[in-house]
A protein has these predicted regions:
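A nucleotide- and high-energy phosphate-metabolite-utilizing enzyme signature
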Residues: 1-491
């Protein structure tokens, strides 16, 4: 991390561009070497953020105030970090996003501060995104544009008039809470658009670790929506308020750290921004992270297996969190109530799905066999399991394997499901919540496992489940291929 001596050296060199550039390069190299030794994603981006803060504040003291003061109450202008930099997650090749916030009566001060800082930053080689805004501008632009609103949501004071910045925080926070449902709809549409562009599955052969499904952006959406809808400023705060389970917080924290290490190393190695895990990068990163080849399993396959497992958990946690934010419409609640009927005393079957009503949640969680019964009822009724019930099943299983799952009766009930139509969908849902690998521990080794070539589109677990579903489709189909399959099946 940046030491007081580092900060003093940067401040002393702030009037000498060549010397300052050399100090920054030396400090970045020290951060890179620490990253290579310890592979700590969170610590590395925090160190890069702290370095940028120190550089900017040294320049501010030199070119704006010619003194030591950072907080200048009444000056009418504040320098604010926004976006990823404001969030405190500055990767090696990230842009620097700044907002120069000014009071309407101090526009001249705002222009002078922005000019005084931007030119030295450009001379140092930084790519700086910047804006000059009043509080009113922030509210109006944030209202019209969800991307601007998101960047402002992550604002962080750096220097200047802190009182002005705090007034912005209050006004923007009030507007954010008032318009949280609109923001939710905007961000969900944006999220789907990102999936359409960067890949609708976690299991891409060459995923974008930031924007593909299961990438860092999924984590950002949880943070953004948690902030907008609940005012929570961290994953820990979401968990403390019961909006994330302990296992979900653990999955998100692990994803942030591991993906942070990978992205940091990609930026350092390339010397520029780039987030696509190409085949060549997969091999290099596997070696960097210490994944060695084993008999019948390459190091790169082990690395990508961890990536797919982690990104799947990240994406599924994000999906569950977003479902908690979405309220069913009145019409939806009415139609569900009209068509609902109880089955097995715990479950409710509607025309759309099998669910667990709120009044039965405690009974469901207290019964170790309830999760398997849920899937058996859904298969027998020819309905999918409701997303809320899948979330509940995932929660019930999050404590780890239960001895009940290894009991002969459990195994018998499980394999009995294979004799009924719909087993393909049932197995896929079981896999989503983690039940399949608890009933069949051998299946866990197939989870997220990808063969390292361009010919296998899916991981071993997904490929296996799709093969079962294909067999189900053939068994119930009417085409020539289905007919041949049914004739052959009759003679097995």
């Amino acid at each position: 991390m940046l030491t007081p001596a580092d900060g003093e050296a940067l401040a002393a060199a702030s009037g000498d561009p060549a010397r300052l550039r050399a100090l920054i390069a030396a400090r970045r190299e020290a951060i890179r070497l620490e990253h290579a030794r310890h592979r700590c994603g969170g610590e590395t981006v925090a160190a890069l953020t702290a370095l940028m803060d120190a550089v900017l504040r040294a320049l501010y003291r030199r070119v704006v105030v010619a003194g030591d003061a950072l907080d200048r109450p009444g000056s009418g202008c504040a320098v604010v970090a926004v976006g990823g930099y404001g969030r405190g997650e500055l990767f090696p090749a990230s842009d620097i996003d700044l907002m120069f916030l000014y009071d309407p009566a101090a526009r001249g001060e705002g222009l002078a501060v922005s000019k005084g800082l931007l030119h030295p930053l450009w001379d140092l080689g930084y790519t700086v995104g910047h804006s000059l805004r009043r509080i009113r501008d922030c509210l109006e632009l944030g209202h019209r544009d969800a991307t601007i609103r998101t960047a402002l949501m992550e604002a962080r004071w750096l220097a200047g008039d802190r009182t002005l910045y705090e007034a912005f925080e209050r006004a923007f926070g009030a507007r954010l809470r008032k318009e949280s449902r609109v923001y939710l709809a905007q961000k969900l549409a944006e999220r789907q658009g990102g999936y359409d562009r960067y890949g609708s599955t976690v299991y891409l052969l060459e995923p974008d670790i930031k924007k593909s499904k299961g990438g860092l952006r999924d984590l950002h959406y949880v943070s953004w929506l948690g902030r907008a809808c609940y005012g929570a400023k961290s994953l820990d705060e979401l968990a403390d308020r019961g909006l994330l389970t302990a296992s979900e917080r653990r999955d998100l924290t692990e994803a942030r750290e591991v993906l942070g290490v990978i992205r940091t190393e990609m930026h350092f190695h390339a010397g520029k921004a780039g987030d696509v895990l190409t085949f060549d990068e997969q091999v290099r990163l596997a070696r960097f992270l210490g994944y060695e080849d084993r008999p019948h399993l390459l190091g790169v396959e082990r690395f990508m297996q961890q990536y797919y497992r982690l990104s799947t958990a990240l994406h599924q946690t994000g999906e569950r969190f977003i479902r908690r934010l979405q309220r069913p419409t009145v019409w939806r609640r009415l139609t569900t109530a009209v068509t609902a009927r109880e089955v097995e005393t715990v479950f409710v079957v509607t025309r759309d799905a099998v669910s667990v009503p709120d009044r039965r949640r405690a009974a469901f969680l207290a019964d170790p066999g309830a999760v398997l019964t849920l899937f058996a009822v859904a298969q027998a009724q020819g309905r999918p399991v409701a997303e809320s019930a899948l979330d509940l099943a995932h929660h019930a299983l999050s404590g780890g394997p239960s001895p009940w799952l290894a009991a002969p009766e459990t195994q018998r009930r499980f394999f009995h499901l294979f004799a009924s139509p719909g087993i393909g969908r049932t197995l896929e849902m079981m896999h989503r919540v983690g039940l399949l690998e608890q009933i069949l521990p051998e299946f866990a080794s197939a989870k997220g496992l990808m063969q390292f070539n361009q010919y296998h589109k899916y991981t071993v677990d997904v490929h296996s489940l799709r093969a079962v579903q294909a067999a189900c489709d053939l068994a119930g189909g009417s085409g020539r291929l289905a007919g041949a399959y049914q004739i052959g099946r009759a003679h097995v």
